[in-house]
Amino acid sequence: MKGILGRKVGMTQIFSDNGIVIPVTLIEVKPNIVSNVLTDEKNGYKAIQLSLEDKKKSRQRKPEIGHFAKANTTPKRFVKEIRDMQGFELGSNVDVSIFTPGEFVDVTGISKGKGFAGTIKRHNQKIGPKSHGGGGGSKPVRQTGSLGDISGNKVVKGMTMPGHLGHEQVTIQNLEVIMTDVKNNILLVKGAVPGPKKGFVVIKECAKKIPSKEAVKLVDLEIVAKKNHLFEISKKYNINLKNDMSIEEMESLIEKAKEEQEGKGE
Protein backbone atom coordinates (compact mmCIF):
# COMPACT_ATOMS: atom_id res chain seq x y z
CA MET A 1 0.00 0.00 0.00
CA LYS A 2 1.17 3.53 -0.73
CA GLY A 3 -0.41 6.95 -0.38
CA ILE A 4 0.15 10.68 -0.18
CA LEU A 5 -1.65 13.84 0.95
CA GLY A 6 -2.53 16.80 -1.24
CA ARG A 7 -4.87 19.70 -1.98
CA LYS A 8 -7.52 19.80 -4.68
CA VAL A 9 -6.88 22.65 -7.13
CA GLY A 10 -9.80 22.17 -9.53
CA MET A 11 -10.92 20.48 -12.74
CA THR A 12 -9.89 21.04 -16.34
CA GLN A 13 -9.62 19.05 -19.54
CA ILE A 14 -6.64 17.86 -21.55
CA PHE A 15 -6.28 16.10 -24.89
CA SER A 16 -4.71 12.79 -25.82
CA ASP A 17 -2.51 12.56 -28.91
CA ASN A 18 -5.46 11.21 -30.92
CA GLY A 19 -7.73 14.14 -29.99
CA ILE A 20 -9.84 12.59 -27.20
CA VAL A 21 -10.89 15.01 -24.44
CA ILE A 22 -10.00 13.78 -20.93
CA PRO A 23 -11.65 15.45 -17.90
CA VAL A 24 -9.08 15.63 -15.11
CA THR A 25 -8.75 16.92 -11.56
CA LEU A 26 -5.54 18.75 -10.72
CA ILE A 27 -4.18 17.96 -7.24
CA GLU A 28 -1.29 19.86 -5.69
CA VAL A 29 0.90 17.31 -3.91
CA LYS A 30 3.71 19.04 -2.05
CA PRO A 31 6.35 16.76 -0.45
CA ASN A 32 4.87 15.03 2.61
CA ILE A 33 6.87 14.66 5.82
CA VAL A 34 6.97 11.24 7.50
CA SER A 35 6.13 12.38 11.04
CA ASN A 36 5.80 8.90 12.58
CA VAL A 37 6.54 5.27 11.73
CA LEU A 38 4.25 2.71 13.38
CA THR A 39 5.31 -0.94 13.76
CA ASP A 40 3.72 -4.26 14.74
CA GLU A 41 5.92 -4.57 17.83
CA LYS A 42 5.14 -1.15 19.26
CA ASN A 43 1.70 -0.25 17.86
CA GLY A 44 0.14 -3.54 16.77
CA TYR A 45 -0.01 -2.59 13.09
CA LYS A 46 2.21 -1.17 10.36
CA ALA A 47 1.63 2.36 9.10
CA ILE A 48 3.32 5.60 8.19
CA GLN A 49 2.01 8.94 9.42
CA LEU A 50 2.21 11.63 6.74
CA SER A 51 1.85 15.35 7.40
CA LEU A 52 1.39 18.37 5.16
CA GLU A 53 1.57 22.17 5.49
CA ASP A 54 2.89 24.03 8.52
CA LYS A 55 0.52 25.18 11.25
CA LYS A 56 0.43 28.79 12.41
CA LYS A 57 2.64 29.28 15.44
CA SER A 58 -0.33 30.57 17.44
CA ARG A 59 -2.15 27.26 16.88
CA GLN A 60 0.71 24.94 17.81
CA ARG A 61 0.40 23.00 21.07
CA LYS A 62 3.23 21.67 23.21
CA PRO A 63 2.37 17.95 22.70
CA GLU A 64 2.33 18.53 18.92
CA ILE A 65 5.63 20.39 19.00
CA GLY A 66 7.24 17.50 20.89
CA HIS A 67 5.77 14.88 18.55
CA PHE A 68 6.91 16.59 15.34
CA ALA A 69 10.32 17.48 16.81
CA LYS A 70 11.20 13.77 16.63
CA ALA A 71 10.96 14.10 12.84
CA ASN A 72 12.93 17.39 12.86
CA THR A 73 9.93 19.39 11.67
CA THR A 74 7.17 21.65 12.98
CA PRO A 75 3.47 20.82 13.62
CA LYS A 76 1.42 20.36 10.45
CA ARG A 77 -2.18 21.14 9.51
CA PHE A 78 -3.10 17.89 7.76
CA VAL A 79 -1.96 14.59 9.29
CA LYS A 80 -3.06 11.10 8.20
CA GLU A 81 -1.89 7.51 8.62
CA ILE A 82 -1.42 5.24 5.60
CA ARG A 83 -1.71 1.58 6.66
CA ASP A 84 0.82 -1.00 5.46
CA MET A 85 3.02 1.64 3.81
CA GLN A 86 6.71 0.86 4.22
CA GLY A 87 10.13 1.90 2.99
CA PHE A 88 10.31 5.43 4.44
CA GLU A 89 12.24 6.62 7.48
CA LEU A 90 11.15 9.11 10.13
CA GLY A 91 11.63 12.67 8.87
CA SER A 92 11.98 11.69 5.19
CA ASN A 93 9.98 13.21 2.32
CA VAL A 94 7.37 11.49 0.16
CA ASP A 95 6.61 13.10 -3.20
CA VAL A 96 4.28 12.49 -6.12
CA SER A 97 6.81 10.22 -7.87
CA ILE A 98 5.45 7.23 -5.90
CA PHE A 99 2.64 7.11 -8.49
CA THR A 100 3.06 6.57 -12.23
CA PRO A 101 0.67 7.34 -15.13
CA GLY A 102 -1.66 4.42 -15.81
CA GLU A 103 -2.06 3.44 -12.14
CA PHE A 104 -5.45 3.50 -10.40
CA VAL A 105 -5.95 5.29 -7.09
CA ASP A 106 -8.65 5.95 -4.48
CA VAL A 107 -9.11 9.59 -3.47
CA THR A 108 -10.71 10.50 -0.12
CA GLY A 109 -11.90 13.97 0.85
CA ILE A 110 -14.62 15.91 2.67
CA SER A 111 -17.52 16.60 0.30
CA LYS A 112 -18.93 20.08 -0.24
CA GLY A 113 -21.35 21.13 2.51
CA LYS A 114 -24.77 22.14 1.16
CA GLY A 115 -26.49 23.11 4.41
CA PHE A 116 -29.96 21.98 5.52
CA ALA A 117 -31.86 20.01 2.87
CA GLY A 118 -35.13 18.13 2.64
CA THR A 119 -35.57 14.45 1.90
CA ILE A 120 -36.18 15.02 -1.83
CA LYS A 121 -32.70 16.44 -2.34
CA ARG A 122 -30.92 14.63 0.50
CA HIS A 123 -32.24 11.09 0.00
CA ASN A 124 -33.76 11.23 -3.50
CA GLN A 125 -37.29 10.56 -2.26
CA LYS A 126 -40.26 10.86 -4.59
CA ILE A 127 -42.27 14.09 -4.85
CA GLY A 128 -45.93 13.62 -3.92
CA PRO A 129 -48.90 14.02 -6.33
CA LYS A 130 -49.56 17.64 -7.31
CA SER A 131 -53.19 17.03 -8.34
CA HIS A 132 -56.29 16.06 -6.29
CA GLY A 133 -55.49 18.42 -3.45
CA GLY A 134 -51.74 17.90 -3.44
CA GLY A 135 -49.48 20.88 -2.96
CA GLY A 136 -51.67 22.59 -0.39
CA GLY A 137 -51.20 23.00 3.34
CA SER A 138 -52.78 19.63 4.18
CA LYS A 139 -50.90 17.68 1.48
CA PRO A 140 -47.49 19.25 0.84
CA VAL A 141 -45.77 17.44 -2.03
CA ARG A 142 -42.23 17.61 -0.60
CA GLN A 143 -43.04 16.50 2.94
CA THR A 144 -41.44 13.39 4.44
CA GLY A 145 -43.64 10.30 4.19
CA SER A 146 -44.33 7.69 6.86
CA LEU A 147 -41.69 7.26 9.57
CA GLY A 148 -42.65 3.67 10.36
CA ASP A 149 -45.25 1.50 12.07
CA ILE A 150 -47.82 2.94 14.48
CA SER A 151 -46.34 0.99 17.39
CA GLY A 152 -42.94 1.63 18.88
CA ASN A 153 -43.50 5.30 19.72
CA LYS A 154 -40.09 6.27 18.41
CA VAL A 155 -38.23 7.10 15.22
CA VAL A 156 -35.92 4.24 14.26
CA LYS A 157 -32.25 5.18 14.02
CA GLY A 158 -31.09 5.72 10.44
CA MET A 159 -34.48 6.90 9.14
CA THR A 160 -34.16 9.10 6.05
CA MET A 161 -35.14 12.57 7.24
CA PRO A 162 -34.29 16.20 6.47
CA GLY A 163 -30.95 17.41 7.77
CA HIS A 164 -27.47 18.59 6.90
CA LEU A 165 -26.43 17.57 3.38
CA GLY A 166 -22.79 17.06 2.47
CA HIS A 167 -19.64 17.83 4.47
CA GLU A 168 -18.88 14.16 5.06
CA GLN A 169 -16.00 11.88 4.18
CA VAL A 170 -16.33 10.49 0.66
CA THR A 171 -14.02 8.15 -1.27
CA ILE A 172 -13.99 7.94 -5.06
CA GLN A 173 -12.45 4.65 -6.18
CA ASN A 174 -10.46 3.60 -9.23
CA LEU A 175 -9.43 6.97 -10.66
CA GLU A 176 -6.73 6.69 -13.31
CA VAL A 177 -3.50 8.65 -12.89
CA ILE A 178 -3.03 10.62 -16.11
CA MET A 179 0.13 12.58 -15.34
CA THR A 180 2.61 13.28 -12.54
CA ASP A 181 4.82 16.37 -12.40
CA VAL A 182 7.46 16.08 -9.67
CA LYS A 183 9.01 19.46 -10.50
CA ASN A 184 5.74 21.38 -9.97
CA ASN A 185 4.23 18.95 -7.38
CA ILE A 186 1.21 18.20 -9.57
CA LEU A 187 -0.90 15.05 -9.94
CA LEU A 188 -3.61 14.72 -12.61
CA VAL A 189 -6.31 12.06 -12.16
CA LYS A 190 -9.13 11.27 -14.55
CA GLY A 191 -12.58 12.29 -13.27
CA ALA A 192 -13.93 14.17 -10.27
CA VAL A 193 -12.54 14.27 -6.74
CA PRO A 194 -14.67 14.96 -3.61
CA GLY A 195 -14.54 18.32 -1.87
CA PRO A 196 -14.20 22.00 -2.73
CA LYS A 197 -11.19 23.71 -4.27
CA LYS A 198 -8.26 23.91 -1.83
CA GLY A 199 -9.73 21.00 0.16
CA PHE A 200 -7.33 18.40 1.58
CA VAL A 201 -7.44 14.94 -0.01
CA VAL A 202 -5.78 11.56 0.58
CA ILE A 203 -4.59 9.68 -2.52
CA LYS A 204 -4.00 5.96 -1.97
CA GLU A 205 -3.28 2.92 -4.08
CA CYS A 206 -6.63 1.45 -5.17
CA ALA A 207 -8.09 -1.07 -2.72
CA LYS A 208 -9.45 -3.29 -5.52
CA LYS A 209 -5.94 -3.93 -6.87
CA ILE A 210 -6.80 -3.06 -10.47
CA PRO A 211 -3.71 -3.67 -12.62
CA SER A 212 -2.10 -0.61 -14.19
CA LYS A 213 -2.85 0.14 -17.83
CA GLU A 214 -0.74 1.76 -20.50
CA ALA A 215 -0.28 5.46 -19.79
CA VAL A 216 -2.36 7.84 -21.91
CA LYS A 217 -0.25 9.62 -24.51
CA LEU A 218 -1.00 13.32 -24.21
CA VAL A 219 -0.79 15.86 -26.98
CA ASP A 220 2.51 17.77 -27.12
CA LEU A 221 1.56 21.45 -27.00
CA GLU A 222 4.92 22.59 -28.36
CA ILE A 223 4.53 20.43 -31.47
CA VAL A 224 0.92 21.59 -31.97
CA ALA A 225 1.94 25.25 -31.67
CA LYS A 226 4.78 24.72 -34.15
CA LYS A 227 2.50 22.96 -36.65
CA ASN A 228 -0.12 25.71 -36.37
CA HIS A 229 2.59 28.26 -37.15
CA LEU A 230 3.68 26.26 -40.22
CA PHE A 231 0.06 25.95 -41.40
CA GLU A 232 -0.22 29.75 -41.33
CA ILE A 233 3.01 30.14 -43.32
CA SER A 234 1.87 27.54 -45.89
CA LYS A 235 -1.14 29.69 -46.80
CA LYS A 236 1.21 32.27 -48.35
CA TYR A 237 2.56 29.66 -50.79
CA ASN A 238 -0.74 27.77 -51.42
CA ILE A 239 0.63 24.52 -50.01
CA ASN A 240 -1.71 21.80 -48.72
CA LEU A 241 -0.10 20.51 -45.54
CA LYS A 242 -1.55 17.55 -43.63
CA ASN A 243 -1.71 17.20 -39.87
CA ASP A 244 -0.12 13.73 -39.93
CA MET A 245 3.05 15.17 -41.50
CA SER A 246 6.11 15.65 -39.33
CA ILE A 247 7.47 19.13 -38.66
CA GLU A 248 10.53 18.35 -40.81
CA GLU A 249 8.33 17.38 -43.78
CA MET A 250 6.28 20.57 -43.42
CA GLU A 251 9.38 22.75 -43.22
CA SER A 252 10.95 21.11 -46.30
CA LEU A 253 7.78 21.64 -48.38
CA ILE A 254 7.57 25.28 -47.31
CA GLU A 255 11.27 25.82 -48.07
CA LYS A 256 10.87 24.23 -51.52
CA ALA A 257 7.83 26.40 -52.32
CA LYS A 258 9.68 29.48 -51.10
CA GLU A 259 12.64 28.76 -53.41
CA GLU A 260 10.31 28.19 -56.39
CA GLN A 261 8.54 31.49 -55.76
CA GLU A 262 11.84 33.36 -55.46
CA GLY A 263 13.04 31.72 -58.71
CA LYS A 264 9.94 32.91 -60.57
CA GLY A 265 10.46 36.41 -59.19
CA GLU A 266 13.96 36.57 -60.68
Curated annotation (Swiss-Prot):
The record's keywords, sorted A to Z, are: Ribonucleoprotein, Ribosomal protein, RNA-binding, rRNA-binding
List GO terms (cellular component aspect).
cytosolic large ribosomal subunit
Chain segments carrying region Disordered: 124-149
Checking PROSITE patterns in the record gives: RIBOSOMAL_L3
Gene Ontology molecular function: rRNA binding; structural constituent of ribosome
InterPro entries xrefs:
Ribosomal_uL3 (IPR000597), Ribosomal_uL3_bac/org-type (IPR019927), Ribosomal_uL3_CS (IPR019926), Transl_B-barrel_sf (IPR009000)
Gene Ontology BP annotations: translation
Question: Which Pfam families does the entry link to?
Answer: Ribosomal_L3 (PF00297)
What does the record note on quaternary structure?
Part of the 50S ribosomal subunit. Forms a cluster with proteins L14 and L19.
| Similarity field | Belongs to the universal ribosomal protein uL3 family.
Function description: One of the primary rRNA binding proteins, it binds directly near the 3'-end of the 23S rRNA, where it nucleates assembly of the 50S subunit.
Q: What is this protein called?
A: Large ribosomal subunit protein uL3
Q: Which organism is it from?
A: Mycoplasmopsis pulmonis (strain UAB CTIP) (Mycoplasma pulmonis)
Taxonomic lineage of this organism?
Answer: Bacteria, Bacillati, Mycoplasmatota, Mycoplasmoidales, Metamycoplasmataceae
